[in-house]
A protein has these predicted regions:
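Axial heme c-ligation environment in periplasmic c-type cytochrome domains
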Residues: 628, 632-639, 658-716
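Electrostatic cytochrome c docking/interface patches
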Residues: 585-609, 614, 619-626
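Aromatic, loop-rich ligand-recognition surfaces of beta-strand-rich domains
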Residues: 748-863
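Structural detector for internal amphipathic alpha-helices that build alpha-solenoid repeat scaffolds
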Residues: 416-419, 441-452, 471-485, 490-496, ...
Length: 863
């Protein structure tokens, strides 16, 4: 599936010429794609020598449209089936509640899944499944709510349902909603899109803690150190934000990708790529990541050691699976494709669509094959789109309702045994923490924390301190943390261990003790700022920054420590990544904004970092991509954008109805997806955020503003272009020499603020005082919708808090609006345009040390 964003959620294609000649689309009808049996499909798949795929399940076993897969402690498989996903080219009836989570069991424990039940049916596109003990967490589409289900009579069908986390509705396209729900080493549960993590809290509702957004879309994975790996489709990066655990920030560094990493090498040439010609080679193969998803870090013990620790990521549009070889040098993680102009797995079957991968209890890797013709959601296959023409050209929309699960095995290994961990004692589970298969270690830790049995604390402490297996020690440490039984002496033992990875875990796990009040550990943490290992130094900087953050405030002088550690290090990696960690800022809003405005801005930042960043970048400069010219981005920059900075209605209209065509003189080949399905508050939040970020300063937009504009554009079909949007917005009327201008201070120069001369200005010469005013008399009474004051030549002299009044005779005044200035360009929009002959701006509050100035004054919607 395609997942991307374009202010806030879209996929853009950018011209990319990898060859001298450019592919020119040809939509001549072709023979419709064939539906192959699993046995026939297998013959189309290329794998490296020694590897093979085994069929585990298919539509013969009743599965349809599988999208996610996971295992419980007894090795039973749960599959989320999106049975209404794109059943025709328009995605008709997609939100009918007929999706299921199916359960599959190997009754003979031989890896042959021969018992099949519908664990839960009548669901709305179930997207996340997390087995606990005999309970299972499930989340459906269009909601953030997560319910806990239980099969109480052993028939394989859930018969109880209780709310676990109530998050409320989730609006937007189904491809731009959360996925993942993985229980990670730090005992927190993570998802994509949502800038928070959850923690099991017994029978109570979960703990919830805000975190940076990882920028993931479909799929989540963790490695042996508990670091989450995120995939990115809309930004066409493949994998990203893998430098640090996401708790500390979503960081990327130059050179983390091998030079050609983002180029892909399919076996099949069908140009059903959202990027169109710009993403297509002359042989019609995809030339670049465009739908990356379903990643997994190989952690099983029944696959070659050379593969373990590498990340596999699917590219379903390219019908391939990329292997990312992972190396760490000087604290910086690097990834590369080990196959020259080829891939780990690829197929010539057009319907080969791997959308997820997971490590299995048997030490092998499981691949979820949606097996379908059309993979993009209907929003990107609308009438007139490039993609629709290709879909119809090959009849891709006619292949649906299938699904396969494959097991990746190697000739040198036999799959391992099936587990019965749900029936094991806590003591037996402690022993499983030493298992060579990461799935067993993860599951044992999760079950121990769920049981909450502290009788095993001595055994866990012994394992953590004295095992010869570093991975066992790591899991024991975090299990103690999850049970609330971690002691400072255990943390200190890790902080001084010879293994640098264990020192890092000592820092990370020790944070929970500092947050609980044991600040004595900070002195121990500080010693690692001079550690000989770059990764340990970086972790000490991240730990210091986290503990000193405004939300925690447990490390008062953290800035001094971080600066010292960064300056003292001779490591290039510490210098590069450490500087990024140190300077990253999450601040939004502030004291210049009212409480309700700050609330909108914070919500807008959350939305932006969940959705919009994938195309516009975290810094609002546009997501950089490869192309024939340097500096190409997948979407236009938002800083200094006329649409964003201009009349407030512009960005709202763009969000509601989308945009297409050239933007700022540059052509981006796909249109912006309309976001009208989201609430007025949602639109207001993200619009206000982009208008007050990336160097922009503009009036905050309210939900009432959005409701008004939504009513105005009701019935509009199609999207805006730059030209049509500009024509639809109220005009700015420049000042005229016919205006009579006066002021409470320096009235003799008041006309300078309305002379349309950028070289002159009116200025009070004294500090702003309550009651100061500036007045304009128009030649005739006119309908005015707002005012705009520009003081670029004196940027700090803007009015901090002011009101605007109107009058027909200069004696009786009526209120037009009251607002506060934010920058050198101040805007005041009236709740409704009113007829007035006089306008008076009056300061509501004094401002010490700053005069009031106006360089250019304009009226909005002068008629």
């Amino acid at each position: 599936m395609r997942k991307a964003v374009f202010l806030p959620v879209m996929i853009l294609a950018v011209a990319y010429a990898a060859e001298e000649k450019v592919y020119e689309p040809d939509f001549t009808p072709q023979p419709p794609v064939k539906i192959l049996s699993p046995e026939e499909e297998l013959k189309t798949i290329d794998l490296p020598e020694g590897y093979r795929l085994e069929l585990v399940l298919s539509e013969r076993d009743g599965i349809k449209e599988p999208a996610n897969l996971t295992f419980d402690g007894n090795g039973r498989m749960y599959i989320a089936e999106l049975r209404t996903y794109m059943q025709d080219i328009d995605g008709s009836n997609e939100h009918d509640p007929i999706g299921v989570v199916s359960r599959h069991e190997s009754t003979k424990r031989d890896g042959n899944f021969d018992k099949h039940t519908l664990y839960r049916d009548k669901m709305l596109l179930p997207r996340m499944v997390l087995p606990l003990d005999d309970r299972v967490l499930i989340n459906e589409t269009d909601t953030l709510d997560i319910f806990v289900y239980r099969d109480t009579n052993g028939d394989g069908i859930a018969d109880t349902k209780e709310p676990w986390f109530v998050g409320g509705p989730k609006n937007g396209n189904l491809e731009h909603q959360q996925s993942g729900l993985i229980w990670t080493m730090d005992n927190w549960i993570y998802q994509t899109y949502n800038a928070y993590r959850l923690r099991w809290n017994g029978s109570q509702e979960p703990l919830k803690e805000g975190i940076p957004n990882g920028g993931g879309q479909w799929g989540l994975a963790q490695d042996n150190q508990g670091k989450i790996w995120w995939s990115n489709a809309g930004g066409e990066k493949g994998l990203w934000h893998f430098q640090t655990p996401i708790l500390y920030g979503a960081f990327d560094v130059k050179g983390q990708f091998a030079e050609d990493f983002v180029q892909v090498w399919p076996k099949l040439g069908i140009a059903d790529h959202q990027g169109g010609a710009g993403r297509t080679r002359l042989d019609k193969t995809l030339n670049h990541f465009t739908a990356s998803c379903g990643q997994e870090v190989v952690r099983g013990d029944r696959l070659p050691a050379d593969l373990r620790g590498d990340v596999l990521i699917s590219e379903p549009v390219g019908r391939l699976i990329r292997r990312a070889k992972v190396t760490v040098e000087d604290g910086i993680t690097h990834i590369a494709n080990p196959y020259t102009q080829s891939e780990f797995i690829r197929s010539s079957d057009p319907n080969f669509r791997i959308v997820n991968m997971v490590n299995g209890p048997d030490g092998c890797l499981y691949l979820v094959d949606m097996y379908r013709g059309i993979i993009q959601e209907g929003n990107w296959v609308k009438d007139g789109s490039y993609l629709r023409k290709v879909v119809q050209q090959y009849g891709l929309d006619k292949v649906y309702g299938h699904g396969r699960v494959w097991r990746l095995v190697h000739n040198d290994f036999k799959p391992g045994p099936q587990p019965r961990m749900l029936e094991e004692t806590p003591a037996q589970l402690v022993a499983r923490l030493s298992h060579p298969n990461g799935w067993w270690r993860d599951t044992a830790q999760k079950l121990l924390v769920l049981k909450g049995d502290k009788s095993v604390v001595p055994a866990l402490t012994e394992l953590a301190l004295n095992s010869q297996n570093p991975l066992a020690r790591t899991h024991a440490l975090w299990t103690l943390e999850g049970l609330g039984a971690l002691e400072a002496k255990t943390v200190r033992a890790f902080l001084t261990d010879a293994n640098p990875q264990l020192r890092q875990h000592g820092l990370r796990a020790g944070e929970s003790l500092v947050r609980a009040g044991d600040k004595s550990l900070i002195d121990d943490f500080m010693k690692l700022g001079a550690d000989k290992d770059s990764s340990v130094v970086l972790q000490s900087i991240m730990t210091a920054k986290l503990l000193g953050s405004n939300d925690i405030k447990a490390w008062a002088d953290n800035s001094k420590f971080m600066q010292k550690a960064l300056l003292a290090s001779t490591s290039k990696g510490v210098k590069e990544l450490g500087a990024i960690i140190l300077t990253g800022s999450d601040q939004v809003g502030g004291r210049d904004y009212a409480a309700d405005e700050n609330k909108l801005l914070v919500k807008g930042q959350e939305i932006y970092r969940e959705l919009c960043f994938a195309c516009h970048g975290y810094d609002g400069k546009g997501m950089a991509i490869d192309g024939p010219k340097p500096g190409m981005t997948i979407a236009p920059p938002l800083g200094a954008s006329k649409t964003v900075r201009g009349h407030r209605d512009g960005v709202v209209r763009a969000l509601l109805n989308g945009m297409s065509g050239p933007i700022g003189g540059k052509t981006y080949d796909a249109q912006m997806v309309p976001m009208a399905m989201n609430s007025d508050e949602w639109i207001a939040s993200v619009a206000s955020y982009v208008r007050n970020s990336f160097g922009n300063k503009g009036a905050v937009i309210t939900a009432k503003d959005v409701a008004r504009i939504r009513e105005e554009v009701k019935g509009m079909t199609g999207s805006w272009t730059n030209e049509t949007l500009e024509a639809a917005l109220p005009k700015l009327s420049p000042a005229s020499k016919d205006w009579k201008v006066s002021a409470s201070d320096q009235s003799e120069t008041a006309q300078n603020g309305c002379d349309a001369d950028g070289k002159t200005r009116w200025e009070t010469k004294s500090d702003q005082k309550k009651g100061m005013w500036y007045q304009i008399e128009l030649p005739v009474a006119s309908k005015v919708g707002g005012i705009r004051m520009d003081l670029s030549s004196r940027p700090s002299a803007f009015p901090k808090n002011y009101k605007v009044e109107g009058s027909l005779d200069g004696k009786k005044w009526f209120a037009l609006g009251s607002t506060h200035g934010l920058s050198s360009v101040c805007e005041a929009y009236f709740s409704e345009a009113k007829v007035t002959k006089f306008l008076r701006i009056t300061l509501n509050d004094p401002t010490k040390g700053q005069p009031w100035a106006i360089q250019e004054f304009q009226l909005i919607a002068l008629k």
